[in-house]
Amino acid sequence: MLSMSNDRADTGGRILRAAASCVVDYGVDRVTLAEIARRAGVSRPTVYRRWPDTRSIMASMLTSHIAAVLREVPLDGDDREALVKQIVAVADRLRGDDLIMSVMHSELARVYITERLGTSQQVLIEGLAARLTVAQRSGSVRSGDARRLATMVLLIAQSTIQSADIVDSILDSAALATELTHALNGYLC
């Protein structure tokens, strides 16, 4: 027998998956809580018990999605080389991700690019800072405040993801990955 907490987690997961499918189909700016509930097979009050509004659902969905991508791309070591390899691979996946690209072309993206750090960005900064601290101890990453370094790494990678399409005629996917690798290695040495 499933516990109520498993049912609750499954319902939350269905809601987030429904939100993701709405974003891909309609774009972030046209997603409604009613459509998310319909696709998840739940009532609107069920959604409201978990999130206060559509924007909160979007934030949770993005955080969950980015965390899943991070889990899919292994970190093969504790040094700078392994970390840079993972960051470049994650950036490559996110550049080709329908959900992320749908979000990138929305008003929501403008908020998280120009006005404030979102939850997923903060999670990435904290995770990167922890990994950079380990790499600093081994001497493969230069000294400095790991959180500041992580924030700059996020900005570099985020810019690459956002701008890949506009520079595609100059930097195809492979060249972009090569240049991002050089940029990150140069910054972290």
UniProtKB/Swiss-Prot annotation:
Higher taxonomy: Bacteria, Bacillati, Actinomycetota, Actinomycetes, Mycobacteriales
Top-rank taxon: Bacteria
Matches recorded under PANTHER family: HTH-TYPE TRANSCRIPTIONAL REGULATOR RUTR, MYCOFACTOCIN BIOSYNTHESIS TRANSCRIPTIONAL REGULATOR MFTR-RELATED
Gene3D superfamilies hit by this protein: Tetracycline Repressor, domain 2
Keywords: DNA-binding, Transcription, Transcription regulation
UniProt xrefs under InterPro entries: DNA-bd_HTH_TetR-type_CS (IPR023772), Homeodomain-like_sf (IPR009057), HTH-type_TetR-like_transc_reg (IPR050109), HTH_TetR (IPR001647), Tet_transcr_reg_TetR-rel_C_sf (IPR036271)
Residue span(s) of domain HTH tetR-type: 9-69
Portion annotated as DNA-binding: 32-51
Protein known as: Uncharacterized HTH-type transcriptional regulator Mb2274c
Organism (species): Mycobacterium bovis (strain ATCC BAA-935 / AF2122/97)
SUPFAM superfamilies: Homeodomain-like, Tetracyclin repressor-like, C-terminal domain
GO molecular-function terms, A-Z: DNA-binding transcription factor activity; transcription cis-regulatory region binding
